[in-house]
Amino acid sequence: MQLNGWDHALKVTADGKGLVGHAGVILLRKAADMTGLTGQLSGALRQKGTSPLLDRGMVLASMAAAVALGATSMSDIALLAHLAPLLGTAPSGPTVRRALDLAGTPRALDRIARARAVARERAWSLIAAASSGFPWLAVAGKVLDGWVVIDMDATLVTAHSDKEGAAPAWKKGYGFHPLGAWCRNTRECLAMKLRPGNAGSNTFTDHEEVLSAALGQVPSRFRRKVLVRVDGAGASHDLIRHLLSLSSKRKTALFTTGWMITEADEDAIRMIPADAWKPGTRQDGTAENDKDVAEITGLLSRAENWPDGLRWIARRVKPSRRQARNLTAYEKQTGWRYSVTCTNIPDLGIAGVPGSHHPQFIDVLHREHAVVETAGVRTAKAMGLRGLPSKTWQVNCGWVIAANIAADLAAWTRLLGCHDDPELRDADPGTAPLPGLAPPRQARPTRPPAHPRHQPRLAMGRCVPDLLAAANRPVGTRMTSTNNPGNTKGGQPGAVGAGAHPVTPGTPAPHHQNQNGHEDQKRKPTQSVTGPRDA
């Protein structure tokens, strides 16, 4: 069975005939093929003694592409029906369910994780070789060159009916409580564990499992310097000991975590001299007003119960009206709201990052973890995790994997296909989906080239500008093609044909009367995609 090669003669035209919808999903499938993910998934889901009509790895990759388009159920695989002339017949809903049921088994989950790691190594190599380079994180105006940042967080997924594993959640909801780990640099979902709704927020075994799986997804050449950030809900003695044990002679693992304030912490804060409080720092490196930071490492009495090598940073801010209801007696007395960050960043700071030893830098570094709510959780819910489609636990585990793969494909498409456009490269799929995923295009067979050219990286960069131009063009703009000599009149490229009215961008199209005397808007050609004859 041919899993890829469907795009060996892919072209973009502007004649507006034979249109298909969701043509931008071609970029996602191209990313899966060029990184080797489709083939790796095929091997991971292959079973001895079976020969399904549709390869299960290809079905899972197709379902991930449909999830990126907004699929919320297994029957939404029909979103890919428009692309049948290019990708072939889309799988049916029952076929998708069987593939997800297979992918949700513990053995298949391990094999899929290894397959994703192999494809991710290829993708990160291509990203690093792009003109923009690998996206290193910048904090307080300082670039963490060479550091891979992993953010861990849990979220609630509501279940609107009885499903296997659903349980009452701590926020008085009902559903599931998955725990995930995201790469802040690329915004990929490295690992995620589906858990019942009543799962704890600071369960060490779950955090250890997800973190180990996430580190296994990081390519070995990028694993030498890793920074892990966890919020206060996930902090525990066991987790901090585990984070400290990750460092070795060959790799450095730093972390920051939130801290549940107790009376001992308030006693340490009371001992801070007034002149020790320094203004905090924003993400751009400028100073904050009425938001101060100070270190309490030597003042904290309960530090004896924790491992050596830790530092504690206190932060105080003026409480809002909403926060004023939950203040402690000491906070009400002082008029400040306090929070504490725990870290193992040494007194000398991070090597190669000037000023990283200051409490202000550590404070802003940990506060940047809040971005996981938008760049991680919101993106995940925009791509399939707003709800789980099945009543069975195993199928829902397979759906979570498909949603994670969809987030990976969207990230690779941004970083490889849009690497030369900072706005599109950093777009948030939750609020600004990739352009070109919905506009109709055309699929038409063409003769394959005699000697196909092999690109050193994703060849989809050739069609991205055309797709983006079509997606961003105003409604009233007349489209022309510089590659189509038929769009010329009188030797002038792009001239308007006889009987047509030229349209300027931003103005409504002209109206014409039909034979019945009614006005109808003249249809305009739309950009299109062509595929091979044997697609």
Give residue spans per PLM region:
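Basic, amphipathic alpha-helical segments enriched in Lys/Arg and hydrophobic/aromatic residues
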Residues: 386-453
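Short amphipathic alpha-helical "interface-anchor" segments enriched in bulky aromatics
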Residues: 31, 77, 359-393, 398, ...
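Dynamic "connector" segments at or just before major functional cores
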Residues: 1-173, 180-200, 205-221, 249, ...
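Domain-level cores of phosphate- or acyl-group-handling catalytic modules
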Residues: 201-264
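Short, well-ordered loop/turn and helix-capping segments at boundaries between secondary-structure elements
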Residues: 83, 245, 261, 271-278, ...
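Flexible loop/turn segments at secondary-structure boundaries
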Residues: 87, 157-159, 188, 198-201, ...
